[in-house]
Amino acid sequence: MTLNDRHRGKLFSIGMKMAEVPDADHRLLGVIRRLGLNFGFGEKTVGEVCEEAGVNPHTLLLISKIYAYDGYVPSAEELSRSSMRDILTYLHNSHDFYIDIALEALDKAIHAMMNTCDEKHYKILMRFYGGYRDEILKHFEYEEKTVFPYVRAIDGGKTTEGYGIEQYEENHSDVDEKLNDLKNIVMKYLPQDCDNNLIQKLSLIHI
């Protein structure tokens, strides 16, 4: 997203007030929680809050920039200063969030929409949504059981065989394609009397 005028040109920093971080992008409230940081930080800085929680502050800044700056690509230096342990914690907690909250909300939106759709459109949507949901859950399981242990091993200086990160990239692209297919079905083919708010809910889901 484009930063608002207050944050245009303003860099995230360890010395800034933690309460100011979500001003750049409201989604950073979720980032803060999924890194294991509790609210109620008052006037404390990013560095102070992270130190108290045992979280690498550079990791928070890195993820915040990815959310707040369009097309942001972190430098090698930024990546080296961040904690892989904290990044994996964030990703694991994100899985819990999507399964327990985001997908549950999407389930309810899908079924609420069915009340106004005919049988033909019901079958079309459910086929694509069912495929997307299954793909997401399989993807999360794949990350938890295969990708995260691989990354932990590499981060710990261990060598691994039989798996490469390029395999992860291919798997992740399949998930994105499923979501795009579902969005296209909703936008192009569902009648106007169906719930138009569904596409907005779909737009909030990004893995």
Language-model features, listed with the residues they occupy:
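Small-residue-biased structural context
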Residues: 1-205
